[in-house]
């Protein structure tokens, strides 16, 4: 291992920009039925499948951290579900502990004293500059991040902090900052409506984390998870199924913090390979989101379920608009495949043609 690469993401970080080519005016349920009766597959795909092939709107990654200075060789990674603390070890010796603070957008990396000289660097995703044309990708592999034209990031190297500030579009900017304090490394990724606000919030978060210190942050973090796991438990004769239940509840908590975007698919849905995320990281309003949240009441976690319900409730205007445009009727109905703002994205007919999926 030359260095440890850490992917950093923000649940609601999207490039919302819509292409100039809007959805066809015949993107309606009535037209879909008409074409189905005619057996016109080509026209059906043109109207309903083609929009999904465009690179935007899409979920985007926030960036990477690189940690250099640890011994070379093989490592073992593990996650303690009870405390939500990850460990990175070599030959039985823990080389790194990591956790994401519940309730605040701060990550903490804790090193042994012997590796206090390890170096941390930050890397922006490989967004494009507008020179690369859209690729002929598919829903699973939509193509390179180079298709996305984003302005250059502003670098930060002051007050012991390193990172960058990135404008995404007219509505969104974000900051990825980190700071090394001895054997502890703090990092944060914050989204806001402009660079100035994102920068201000990120610096406040890092300063507050440094003032509190890693040990107190870890105590606070463990206390939160202890209370969370104390609300329900499960014992099954099948250990694999039992672990599946606990993992599902871990994802439910980790991906459903109040005030943030809910999970589209069992957690943050993004790629870490300089590619657009599979299925654009979008919201499939079918079993994909239903299975993620359907158990929140039986597991006694209403606060996490409320994150998803509040999100859907906020999209009621878009739901009414889609009901009129697609079905030609009053009421409220969200697309079964949508962006973070509730806009229809298209996709294969199995996802958009059945009213019961919406």
Residue map of PLM features:
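Residue-level detector of conserved catalytic or cofactor/ligand-binding positions
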Residues: 347-358
């Amino acid at each position: 291992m030359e260095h440890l690469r850490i992917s950093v993401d923000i649940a609601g970080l999207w490039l919302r920009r819509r292409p100039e080519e809007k959805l066809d005016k015949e993107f309606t349920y009535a037209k879909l039925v008409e074409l189905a009766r005619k057996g016109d597959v080509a026209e059906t795909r043109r109207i309903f499948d083609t929009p999904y092939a465009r690179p935007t709107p899409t979920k985007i990654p926030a960036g990477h951290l690189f940690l250099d200075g640890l011994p070379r060789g093989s490592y073992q990674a593990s996650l303690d579900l009870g405390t939500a603390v990850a460990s990175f070890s070599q030959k039985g010796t823990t080389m790194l502990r990591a956790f994401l603070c519940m309730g605040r957008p701060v990550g903490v990396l804790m090193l042994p004293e012997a590796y206090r000289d390890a170096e941390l660097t930050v890397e922006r995703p490989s967004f494009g500059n507008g020179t690369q044309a859209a690729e002929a990708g598919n829903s699973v592999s939509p193509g390179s991040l180079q298709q996305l034209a984003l302005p250059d990031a502003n670098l930060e190297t002051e007050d012991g902090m390193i990172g960058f500030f990135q404008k995404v579009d007219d509505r969104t900017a974000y900051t990825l900052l980190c700071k090394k304090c001895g054997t502890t490394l703090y990092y944060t990724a914050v989204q806001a409506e402009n660079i100035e606000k994102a920068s201000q919030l990120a610096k406040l978060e890092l300063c507050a984390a440094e003032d509190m210190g890693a040990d107190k942050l870890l105590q606070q973090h463990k206390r939160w998870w202890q209370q969370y796991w104390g609300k329900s438990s499960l014992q099954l004769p099948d250990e694999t199924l039992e672990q599946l239940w606990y993992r599902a509840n871990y994802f439910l908590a980790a991906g459903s913090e109040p005030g943030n975007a809910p999970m589209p698919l069992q957690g943050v849905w993004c790629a870490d390979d300089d590619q657009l995320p599979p299925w654009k990281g979008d919201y499939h309003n079918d079993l994909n989101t239903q299975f993620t949240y359907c158990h929140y009441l039986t597991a006694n976690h209403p606060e996490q379920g409320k994150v998803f319900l509040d999100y859907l409730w906020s999209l009621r205007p878009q739901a009414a608009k889609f009901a009129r445009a697609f079905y030609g009727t009053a009421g409220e109905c969200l697309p079964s495949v949508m962006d973070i703002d509730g806009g229809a994205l298209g996709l294969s007919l199995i996802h958009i043609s059945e009213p019961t999926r919406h």
